[in-house]
Amino acid sequence: MDASLKIVIVDENPIRAAILRDGLHEAGHVNVTHIEDRNGLLARIYAIDPDVILIDLENPSRDVLEQMFQMSRVVKRPIAMFVDQTDTASIQASVDAGVSAYIVGNLQKDRIKTILDLCISRFNAFARLQDELDRAKSALEDRKVIDRAKGILMKAKNLTEEQAYALLRKTAMNENKKIADVAQSVITAAELFK
């Protein structure tokens, strides 16, 4: 694991924060910032721009949990959340919010490195899946646009589907554009003439 990682610890309890900090230092991580007060937390996290965020909440209220979950949805970083007690709804909410590791139970410094590694690995795996999903959605949208443009060309120029696609492809190559961009231009032009 990269020892130069910027890590933020969010913990109102200095004793518990020290356990996290000691565990990180023993694992070779020295670039660690402790945020004790949660007021203005999001702005402070953006200012620090950490690689990983560790949040220790001990026994959080529903409001505090929801505040942390909202923050985790926005920051798009590996987040490990430590709590002493939990329930099924909180676990599900943490997963939905994108928390990479939700750790329940005793906070022990010798577990911090493993938890950090797990947190980063799960975040990266989820990010890869999200990227694949985004690419698949984009390809599907492109396919829909291309199909619609082919239909317009087939009707307007009395072409077969293959001929319409070949025309889109040739135009895209000549203009050094993506086929989907040319297809969108065809759709836009057709809508102007309605």
Where are the regions a protein language model picked out?
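Conserved acidic segment of CheY-like receiver
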Residues: 3-15, 20-24, 53
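Conserved phosphotransfer microenvironments
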Residues: 17, 38-42, 51-71
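Short hydrophobic/Thr-rich beta-strand motif most characteristic of the beta2 strand and flanking loop
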Residues: 29-37
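A short, hydrophobic beta-strand element within the central beta-sheet of small alpha/beta folds
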Residues: 53, 77-86
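C-terminal output helix
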Residues: 89, 107-116
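C-terminal output/effector regions of signal-responsive regulators
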Residues: 134-194
